[in-house]
Amino acid sequence: MTDVSEVIGVWRLRAYYLEIVQTGERIEPYGAQPKGVFMIHPDGRVVVVMTPAEQRKSVTETDQAEAFQKLVAYSGLYRVELPDRFVTAVDIAWFEPWVGSEQARRFTVKGDTLEIVSEPTRTPLTGDALVIGVLSWIREGTMRG
């Protein structure tokens, strides 16, 4: 990739899985059809929100806690380190340990598809396990079916 403008825009989540580094096991924490939006603004801010495809309506405190546990939401200022590294300086997040951190990802853009691969990290979704997240996004307005 040589043109940073290729990543600018609004992207919809098409697929998401976590791979446990130690075992190679793959987990789809949000199921086969996760929901998410990844907004990359030309002014240097990114906003990410992801949820499972199927959620119960939050009726009880337990339901609400479960929904929150499966949420991913953060924002911050980003920079692109060519050829393929995207770094977000997180300034607000659902998961307090991410605030003040830099979240680095590798990326590739092929047409209207953006693939993001995280560096090994820990997430509330998998406890203490070190995982690599793999996300496939499609540019909003081009998603079919």
Language-model segments: which ranges?
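Lipid interaction determinants
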Residues: 1-73, 77-145
